[in-house]
Amino acid sequence: MKQKTVLSIAGSDCSGGAGIQADLKTMVMNGVYGMSVITALTAQNTTGVRAIQEVTPDFLQQQLDAVFQDIDPLAVKIGMVPTGDLMHVIADRLRYYQAKNVVVDPVMVASAGSSLMKQNAVQTLVRELLPIATLVTPNIPEAQVLSGMTIANKEDMIGAAKKIGDSYHCAVLLKGGHSINDANDLLYANGELVWFAGKRIDNPNTHGTGCTLSSAIASNLAKGFTLAEAIQRAKAYISGALAAMLDLGQGSGPMMHNFDLQGEWTVSK
């Protein structure tokens, strides 16, 4: 059986709601074989991030080489990368291996508000990672940093998406879930704008939504769907995961990634 393969390059969330844990759950549910290269270990839960331990650039490169020299991923999702040195290694290795379908989720702040990227790393992000991206998926706060613009409405979203895409020559999916009154997302690709309508789901447990969306998009790109199709399918998946209303933890809890998993092996005694 020929299996589609996707690599997540991201941090580890010991509580399981975000990071590589969310990515791998999402990949399984979207029908691909998931692999992970860890950029950092985090001690976090639904209430916040307590500590971050970055890997060394050398160990990061060894992980990347180990994956690409054995199982070539058909898509790559990049999530939390806390330092510019680590971003440089990722960009270098992805160029070397001519990585395909690179989806960059520019994770800067955790759902609970903790910073996940060092401030001086943003310049490395825009200089080295965005130019090799097929798609970048910022939320409103991240798009404001990347574009240098204030985003208060849909017209601002259009302006910011165009500025990011034209500046770094990548497609942009600007997620409207932060501070805009609906869950509509905007794709800017090849000079064209496409809105993806989304019904806002009244669920306070949104830990890992960005990780999940970008991983689902990468999974669908690996399966051969167009960019627009991959986004639509990913949004449908994340809506189902949110609508399942999983309630875990004392803060902003995780989604139910396996909401549509059925089979005798899932039944509890």
Regions found by a protein language model. Name each.
Residues 54, 228-269:
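Charged C-terminal helix
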Residues 119-193:
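Conserved phosphate/ATP/ADP-binding segment of small-molecule kinases
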Residues 21, 144-145, 203-227:
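Short, small-residue alpha-helix embedded
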Residues 31-35, 194, 220-234:
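Phosphate-handling active-site elements
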Residues 16-32:
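N-terminal basic/disordered segments at the start of proteins
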Residues 88-97, 170, 192, 228:
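Nucleotide and nucleotide-moiety/phosphate-recognizing core
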Residues 2-8, 28-104, 108-111:
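Conserved N-terminal subdomain of the carbohydrate kinase-like
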Residues 9-15, 193-207:
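Short pre-catalytic strand/loop immediately N-terminal to key active-site residues, enriched for Gly-Thr
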